[in-house]
């Protein structure tokens, strides 16, 4: 979707109703938790969610995970953060060793009782099942509440909000294959970057393919 199309779509009543509904839910959720934070990657989904949340709680804590050597993939981080203005931002530095660490206490304890995250049903079958079964205001076994205000949003609606509000995002999410959360810029233990994505990237953007495989040699095709 280009910006012109997004601005036209933003005038439609169903879209406006969705934005108002989501904003109302965020206000409702904030009134029911004591110490929330926003899990933010500064991609499209989390940028839209963050912008909506800041209208109700400008001082909310924002947690961004930054991986060692990630600057090879992100060269506009400082620019994006500056464009957002004054944020209550906490940057968490991690590395591959942290990813593979299986100790139960590998994550620090915090006083947070809840977090906002930009999960959407449209992203995958697994996400749809999870969000439908657990709901968008869900308390897990550790008593942490997961809040997913964008659950019902489509890619079109996310793009519309982003363009119509001129939201800055990290350029890593503008690279093919990084636009969706299911093809993450940070692989899990089995380094589950899709083989189809790698094969496609290898042929269309060999420089980006080399950067990824240099850092994660075990996923080389």
How would you name each of these model-derived features?
Residues 1-221:
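Nucleotide-activated chemistry modules centered on ATP-dependent adenylation/adenylyltransferase
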């Amino acid at each position: 979707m280009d910006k012109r199309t997004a601005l036209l779509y933003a005038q439609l009543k169903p879209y406006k109703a969705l934005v108002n509904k989501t904003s109302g839910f965020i206000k409702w959720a904030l009134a029911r938790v004591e110490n929330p934070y926003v899990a933010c990657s500064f991609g499209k989904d989390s940028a839209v969610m963050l912008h909506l949340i800041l209208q109700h709680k400008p001082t909310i804590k924002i947690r961004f995970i930054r991986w060692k050597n990630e600057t090879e993939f992100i060269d506009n981080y400082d620019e994006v953060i500056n464009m957002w203005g004054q944020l209550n931002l906490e940057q968490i530095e991690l590395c591959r060793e942290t990813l593979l660490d299986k100790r139960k206490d590998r994550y620090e304890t915090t006083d947070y009782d809840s977090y906002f995250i930009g999960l959407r049903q449209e992203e995958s079958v697994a996400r749809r099942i999870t969000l439908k079964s657990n709901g968008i205001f869900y308390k897990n076994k550790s008593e942490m509440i997961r809040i997913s205000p964008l659950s019902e949003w489509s890619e079109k609606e996310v793009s519309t909000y982003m363009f119509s509000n001129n939201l800055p995002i990290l350029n890593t999410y503008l690279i093919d294959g990084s636009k969706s959360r299911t093809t993450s810029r940070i692989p899990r233990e089995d380094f589950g970057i899709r083989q189809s994505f790698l094969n496609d990237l290898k042929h269309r953007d060999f420089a980006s393919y080399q950067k990824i495989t240099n850092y994660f040699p075990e996923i080389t095709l």
